[in-house]
Structure formats: structure tokens, C-alpha cells
Amino acid sequence: MSDPLLFVLLGPTGSGKTSLSIALAERFGGEIVNCDSVAVYRELDIGTAKPTHEERESVPHHLFDVLPPTEPMTAGEYARRAREVLKDIASRGKLPIVVGGTGLYLRALLDGLFAGPERSEELREHLRRREQERGPTYLHRILSRMDRVAAAKIHPNDAAKLIRAIEVCLAARKPMTELWQQGRDPLTGFRILRIGLDPDRPALYDRINRRAAEMFEQGLVEETQALLAKYGRIGGPLDSLGYRQAFELLDGKLTREQAVAAAQQGHRNYAKRQMTWFRREPEVRWLKGFGDDAAIVGEAMQIIKTS
């Protein structure tokens, strides 16, 4: 008896993954598993472009809204939870459909991650203080000297990931990328089918620009204001794209027009980094279009039927 099928849908932000995943889930009796590092958090709705309540009612969705924004979700913890969900879905005879754009989460889920050293709160606090003293790019410059490959994969403003990478390099006394291949625990028990969305770049950027502007129109600043009142400046998911620019607007550092433009630019840059990461994924069947194009939906369905 062959292993059950696991369908993985990759693609940059704005490429129509949600639309395609729901169409496939409805057609093949599937259940959708989130693989986005910000969508796991409750109360962050407008800035994450999560599936709507109506979309979530049409087919089962998993690993959305599972944590408050004060609790960190590491890639390893995500992989542990997601593997449990995948096994449960498959045990009920349903098709698990992993959807998302966070490359590190996907790698942790499918390939496993090395067991890194324990966290050092003393070192972390020291690095946070140094960043405050020397500016927002300080941590990225430090990591670039220790591990250029890791630094290239982490956004210069993502302090949490930069601190963890520096911590690992110092504890192991070698670049973190050398450790990534050690002690991994790849996912077994599934036939993995990967499909990636690769829409026309100018058309994708146009969609990204429109969606980022719509987030502000739909109340992103007000949502950010409510999160600030409830949790304070906690960083983490509240430092993600959109929310970061909303904070700068609230602080008076940007006008509304500037905040929208900065969010648009940030999302475009993020889409470019996502595609760079996903191009390194093995055995991906790339579809040249958006996930809500009828031709792309039909092509994806045909691939699943013959797998």
C-alpha cells in the first residue's frame, strides 16, 4: 500500500495561493494547513491576509490563529505541530494541503531542522542593547561576518531571527549554515507533491501594491493601534510587514501615503526573497500564473489526479 499524498503549494505573497488551495481542497476532499509564520497568530488579521471566515468555513483550515502574539512560534515548534496535523488529516482519508510562503517553516516541516544550542537570555539581552545603541542594521552586519549565507536569508530588520542565528554561530563556533545539514529528521510516510505559483512579475507587483493599499483602507492602522494598546511594543509578529509601517505612521515617522508606499515596497521585496528561497526547493512543478486563474486551477487539478 502506497503512502498517502501530501500536496504542498508554494508561491510568493499575492500569487493566489489561498484561492487555488480552496479550489483544490473542495475538489479532492482536502484540508488546508497554514505554513505562514505570521498567520499562526491570533488578532493579526488584516495585515496577514488570512483566509476569510467564509473561506475557512468552506473547507477545514489548520494552524491559523493558534497563538497570541506574545508567544513565539519557532520553526521547530511549527514543524512538530504541523506533522501531527498532517498525520491526523491523512488518517481520516483526507488530502493534506500545505499552503504558505515561509520557506524556513516549510523546510523544517519537510526536511527537519538541526537541534540548535539552548537560548542564552544574557547574550540575547546584550545583543538587543547593542542594536539599540548602534542602529537597526547592526545585528545583520554582525551575522554577515559570521555567516554570509544565513545573513542573506534573513531580513535586516528581523531582530529575533538575527539574534538566534548569532547565538547559534557563537555557541557552535561555526557558521549556522554548516549545522543545517546535521541531525535533521525529514518527514516520512507521505508522497510529497510540490506545486509552485510563478506569476508574471509586473502583474504580481501590481497585485501586491493594490493589496497593501487595501490593508490600510480596511483598518490596518486601527488593528495595529488595538494590538499596541493590549500588548505594547512586543516586537515579534508585530514587527512584520504592514504592522511595522503602521507603527511608524502612528509614531509620526511616516505620513499615511509614505506608510502605504513603504509597505508596498516591503511586500515586493519579500516576494522576491520568497522566490529566491523556493527556487532552491527540489522537485517543484512550477505553474506560470496566478492561483485564481482558471487555467492554473485546471493544470493543478490534472497534476494531482495523475500523482
From Swiss-Prot:
It is an enzyme of class 2 (transferase). The record marks 102, 124 as: Interaction with substrate tRNA. GO terms for biological process: tRNA modification. Its EC number is 2.5.1.75. GO terms for molecular function: ATP binding; tRNA dimethylallyltransferase activity. Its cofactor is Mg(2+). ATP binds at residues 11-18. Keywords: ATP-binding, Magnesium, Nucleotide-binding, Transferase, tRNA processing. The keyword ATP-binding applies. It holds the Pfam family IPPT. It catalyses: adenosine(37) in tRNA + dimethylallyl diphosphate = N(6)-dimethylallyladenosine(37) in tRNA + diphosphate. InterPro entries: Dimethylallyltransferase, IPT, P-loop_NTPase. Substrate binds at residues 13-18. It comes from the Bacteria. Residues 36-39 are annotated as: Interaction with substrate tRNA. Monomer. Catalyzes the transfer of a dimethylallyl group onto the adenine at position 37 in tRNAs that read codons beginning with uridine, leading to the formation of N6-(dimethylallyl)adenosine (i(6)A). Belongs to the IPP transferase family. This is tRNA dimethylallyltransferase. It comes from Koribacter versatilis (strain Ellin345).
